[in-house]
Amino acid sequence: MANEYFKFKRFTVHQDKCAMKVGTDGTLLGAWAQAPQEPSRILDIGTGTGLIALMMAQRYPNASIVGIDIDPAAVAQARDNVTASPFADRISIYEADICHFYENDTFDSVICNPPFFTGDLICPDKQRAVARHTISLSYHDLISSAYKHLSANGRFSVIIPIESQSNFESEALMGGFYLSRLCRVKTTLVKKPKRCLIELRKLPVSESVNTCEVIEINPGIRSDWYKELTYDFYIR
């Protein structure tokens, strides 16, 4: 059973009401995604516990962050986590579907740790199924929504399973995006990449950055890359 809360250096994430708990994927994305300027407006789609919104607020002290989720329980929990954090005055959490979400202005950074199962058996737990499966948000809908809400010079960042990379990149290209950064992530040196961090932009880039990194060099021994990436967040 997952812990009811996860303590970071500057904030604590309670997660007992959320289907999806704090995990490596969300932490990776929250530490890797970029906002192109300060002050920035940042949109966290499917905020869940509010983890990524909190991480971006810590990394960008002058940014204002909006987190949205369709799950009322997750929204309530994210609001509680934000209220208890040092960043409460810069983060707003709303119950909303990104496909019908309306904002007067665009965002400099749009971030999403999207539902990632496309062909697996659907979990009988409705809350968990919505959080985990693309029945709630297809890549096509996510990409078109992100494009609509992203500023001209903004960045759209996601983390997806490596087996979905080709499909996601094709949808992104058809949706008007250009690939600017790509990082394939291995859990250990001997394993194949499991996840893929992707950054997209509306404007063409001269050359995209393509890397492959590893989380652990040996069991329980984090790589220098992962330690540096998450240094400001993990207590140990």
Residue ranges of each PLM-predicted region?
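Conserved Class I SAM-dependent methyltransferase catalytic core
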Residues: 18, 22, 136-193
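General small-molecule cofactor/ligand-binding pocket signal
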Residues: 14, 66, 92-94, 180-183
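A generic structural signal for alpha->beta connector loops
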Residues: 10, 39, 62, 88-90, ...
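Conserved SAM/SAH cofactor-binding pocket of Class I
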Residues: 31-104, 109-112, 118-123
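SAM-dependent Rossmann-like transferase core, predominantly class I methyltransferases
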Residues: 2-41, 47-49, 54, 58, ...
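Residue-level signal for inorganic ion chemistry
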Residues: 29, 113, 142, 200
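SAM/dcSAM-binding transferase cores
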Residues: 190-236
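Mobile active-site "lid"/loop adjacent to the S-adenosyl-L-methionine
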Residues: 114-141
